[in-house]
């Protein structure tokens, strides 16, 4: 049976697959479009399963405001080339729209978009993962994206420009907490024990070591907290001092960066080539 251009176009419109893939699928099913779609879906699922073990540590961070909150989403792929692909970005934005509409959990997002994800993996040829979504509440929100890789949302009592600048600071300086007093007790105790050991190893008398540790702990809690950090736009002042001068405050922030916490496989090119040569001789 001859496959017509109209059949190929219909299958392509319905699946988003390439023209040659559509023609091949139709040829294999003697022009049965519905069967071709089923076969392509099965093939896509098989390809996605094979790609599932591949590390996806590239991708994008997207932000969108909802009603009284903002959603931050990370979607991963394997290469920065695909991270710029229009199909990948369209998929990520589609997921974001659903997330921002009603604070959908990451588990529900994964389930809702699994079929679409599988089809995209088959089309693009890389593992794709809807990794995480975070929500931040606030009537006064400011967001900042540094390229595609870093996204920040800050909420507080301040004008839009001030909050935007603070969001830029968060992107650059990576604070973990809002205020020094927010650093959890267990984190403080762990660092304190480390600093005591360091001071004692330096041969300092106990009373001097204790004073040194107090100073170092103040520095530590300042460095890991937003208001205790030196402000990137006025390094001689802390963020807290700048906010106080403006009669402003920050109550919360979220910072996401593509791939953070993902263990990346170190590629040994020489070893890879050697393995390929060995395989040809086997």
Curated annotation (Swiss-Prot):
Provide the GO MF annotations for this entry: translation elongation factor activity
Q: Which InterPro entries match?
A: EF-Ts_dimer_sf, Transl_elong_EFTs/EF1B, Transl_elong_EFTs/EF1B_dimer, Transl_elong_Ts_CS, UBA-like_sf
> Which residues does the annotated region (Involved in Mg(2+) ion dislocation from EF-Tu) include?
79-82
Q: Which Pfam families match?
A: EF_TS
According to the UniProt entry, where is the signal peptide? none
UniProt keyword annotations, A-Z: Cytoplasm, Elongation factor, Protein biosynthesis
- Keyword hit for Transferase: no
- HAMAP family the record matches: EF_Ts (MF_00050)
> Any idea what job this protein has?
Associates with the EF-Tu.GDP complex and induces the exchange of GDP to GTP. It remains bound to the aminoacyl-tRNA.EF-Tu.GTP complex up to the GTP hydrolysis stage on the ribosome.
Q: What is the designated name of this protein?
A: Elongation factor Ts
Q: Native species of this protein?
A: Shewanella woodyi (strain ATCC 51908 / MS32)
Recall the taxonomic lineage recorded for the source organism.
Answer: Bacteria, Pseudomonadati, Pseudomonadota, Gammaproteobacteria, Alteromonadales
Could you tell me the gene encoding this protein? tsf
């Amino acid at each position: 049976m001859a496959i017509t251009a109209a059949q190929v176009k219909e299958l392509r419109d319905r699946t988003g697959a390439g023209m040659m893939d559509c023609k091949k699928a139709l040829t294999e099913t003697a022009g049965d479009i519905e069967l071709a779609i089923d076969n392509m879906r099965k093939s896509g699922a098989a390809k996605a399963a094979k790609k599932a073990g591949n590390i996806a540590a590239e991708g994008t961070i997207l932000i969108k405001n909802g009603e009284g909150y903002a959603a931050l989403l990370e979607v991963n792929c394997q290469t920065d080339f695909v991270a710029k692909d229009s199909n990948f970005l369209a998929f990520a934005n589609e997921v974001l729209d659903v997330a921002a509409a009603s604070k959908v959990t990451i588990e529900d997002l994964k389930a809702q978009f699994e079929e679409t994800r599988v089809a995209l993996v088959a089309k693009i040829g890389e593992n794709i993962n809807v990794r995480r979504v975070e929500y931040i509440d606030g009537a006064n929100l400011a967001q900042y994206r540094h390229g595609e890789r870093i996204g920040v949302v800050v909420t507080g009592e301040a004008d839009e420009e001030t909050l935007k600048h603070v969001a830029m600071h968060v992107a650059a300086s990576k604070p973990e907490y809002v205020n020094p007093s927010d650093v959890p007790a267990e984190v403080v105790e762990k660092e304190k024990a480390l600093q005591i050991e360091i001071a004692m190893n330096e041969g300092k008398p106990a009373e001097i070591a204790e004073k040194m540790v107090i100073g170092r702990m103040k520095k530590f809690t300042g460095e890991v907290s937003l208001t205790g950090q030196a402000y990137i736009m006025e390094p001689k002042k802390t963020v807290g001092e700048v906010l106080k001068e403006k009669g402003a405050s920050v109550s919360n922030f979220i910072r996401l960066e593509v791939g953070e916490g993902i263990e990346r496989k170190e590629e040994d090119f020489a070893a890879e080539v050697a393995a390929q040569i060995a395989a040809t001789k086997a």
